[in-house]
Regions:
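Terminal hydrophobic membrane-targeting helix
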Residues: 22-106
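Extracytoplasmic beta-rich ectodomain segments of secreted or membrane-anchored proteins
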Residues: 125-128, 132-181, 185-186
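Amphipathic hydrophobic-ligand
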Residues: 71-83, 102-111, 136-158, 186-196, ...
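Beta-propeller and related beta-repeat scaffolds in trafficking/envelope systems
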Residues: 71-90, 162-205, 248-278
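Extended terminal
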Residues: 1-16, 38, 192-198, 202-279
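Short, hydrophobic/aromatic-rich segments at coil-to-beta transitions
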Residues: 92-99, 124, 203-210
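Solvent-exposed loop/turn tips at the surfaces of repeat/solenoid architectures
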Residues: 64, 81, 86-88, 102, ...
């Protein structure tokens, strides 16, 4: 056996030993518990089912449930899921999700960015593929929605001010396409939405300070605040939305009925049943 073969055998044995040691040191049940405890400590009640290692650089789970703050109700179920660890990069990991639920479905790829030893700066690059939302309330003129495109989310908090400082966030929309459907009318297509939303999170209140977005058929802004509660019924909205629509580009028979001037819409009430009022 030549020296290269010997080196290869030693490398294989070493890698196998390391993986066995890793599995013994961090069993799956321990890892599931740590993930759930980490989420709960950040007010993100979450339950992971059937987590498995996918050696050498991944993990898979059959189901992830997002719960309400009292852990009595499942708000969303994601399955199956896969996390690809990137050992050559200390700052990012990839999460691939196939979303399956009664009222939603599709796939999302997320690249997570965070300094190795810091807790005050995070980033997420999102790519959504045919993310579908269906079975909206009958009172809503939009009964279904399909979204594709990308987004970049950045969160950071000034270290000098400690944990009392607000989280500062920026959400960048990148070439987002949306299809709004209603069985009674032709679908409305919104293409190439790009924009930026700047916000703060402090004392369970998310405040949108500045925003702008623009697509082929519309442009607009949104400001206001969202008071975060333990569930959808107690998460309260107080938002102001301004839209300017190029009705000729909507591709819908409703275009002729829509106003040519800017729309100003006030969005209030709980997240579960928001109210839209023209102002």
């Amino acid at each position: 056996m030549n020296k290269y073969a010997v080196i290869a055998v030693y490398a294989l044995v070493g890698l196998t030993s390391f993986l066995v040691f890793l599995l013994l040191l961090f069993p799956v049940s321990f890892l599931e518990s740590r993930i759930e405890n980490w989420a709960v400590s950040r007010n993100i009640p979450m339950q992971v089912n059937n987590l498995e290692y996918d050696f050498p650089t991944g993990m898979e789970f059959s189901e992830l449930n997002l719960l309400n703050i009292r852990r009595t109700e499942t708000l969303a179920t994601l399955r199956p899921g896969r996390v690809d660890l990137q050992p050559l990069s200390l700052f990012s990991n990839r999460l691939n999700l196939s979303l399956q639920g009664a009222t939603f479905g599709g796939s999302v790829q997320a690249d997570l960015r965070a300094p190795l030893f810091a807790t005050n700066a995070y980033g997420v690059d999102l790519i959504a593929s045919d993310l579908r939302f269906v079975d909206f309330p009958p009172s809503s003129w939009v009964r279904s929605m399909v979204v594709s495109g990308g987004a970049d989310l950045q969160l950071n908090r000034p270290e000098a001010r400690g944990t009392s400082a607000p989280w500062i966030g920026v959400l960048q929309l990148e070439d987002v396409d949306a299809l709004l459907g209603n069985p009674a009318v032709q679908d409305i297509v919104l293409d190439n939405l790009n924009g930026k939303i700047e916000f703060l999170i402090q004392n369970n209140v998310l405040t949108i300070e500045k925003s702008n977005f623009k697509g082929d058929a519309l442009q607009g802004t949104i400001t206001g605040r969202i008071t975060l509660g333990p569930d959808q019924d107690r998460t309260m909205l107080a938002l102001d939305l301004t839209l300017r629509v190029d009705t000729a580009k909507l591709g819908s028979p409703l275009s002729a009925l829509l106003p040519k001037k800017a729309w100003r819409i006030r969005i209030t009430g709980p997240l579960s049943t928001p109210r839209f009022t023209a102002t």
